[in-house]
Amino acid sequence: MGKITFYEDRSFQGRHYECSTDHSNLQPYFSRCNSVRVDSGCWMLYEQPNFAGCQYFLRRGDYPDYQQWMGFSDSVRSCHLIPHSTSHRIRIYEREDYRGQMVEITDDCSHLQDRFHFSDFHSFHVMEGYWVLYEMPNYRGRQYLLRPGEYRRYHDWGAMNARVGSLRRIMDFY
């Protein structure tokens, strides 16, 4: 079971809302979110209702302002508690629809292009575990949650292009 608390003001001040499950619409509970405390679990926050818009991965810890979770604004409108998984396996492909070169990964990779020499990554097949995909190397830039399943093209994981710089397993205990 996870637990996350959203605060309207920075440094855990102002009106707050405690949550322990997925929420598709947080708007009734607070108008803005400037700080977050994650007591347990791993969470994906979304700027828009219904798990849409920019995504932000948070694990246990304190985030006194939205820049701490690489947020672009104080807008958090939905959240998803990420299930715990013990094993991780993902296949990445050079082209859409699982074409081109394929590489299977079971660990984090801070710089995909250096490691595999592809210029773009157009499709993914998540066999086991949950992953966070980052737009830039060293776990920076826009973030995307990858759940077990198939992602035939970058639109399937919510991206505007096939630029992928790094990939990290979600491995936090409750």
Swiss-Prot record:
Keywords: Eye lens protein, Repeat. Gene3D superfamilies: Crystallins. Residues 2-40, 41-83, 88-128, 129-171 form the Beta/gamma crystallin 'Greek key' domain. It comes from the Eukaryota. GO terms for biological process: eye development. PROSITE patterns: CRYSTALLIN_BETA_GAMMA (PS50915). Belongs to the beta/gamma-crystallin family. PANTHER family: BETA/GAMMA CRYSTALLIN, GAMMA-CRYSTALLIN E-RELATED. Crystallins are the dominant structural components of the vertebrate eye lens. There are six different gamma crystallins identified in mouse lens. Has a two-domain beta-structure, folded into four very similar Greek key motifs. This is Gamma-crystallin F.
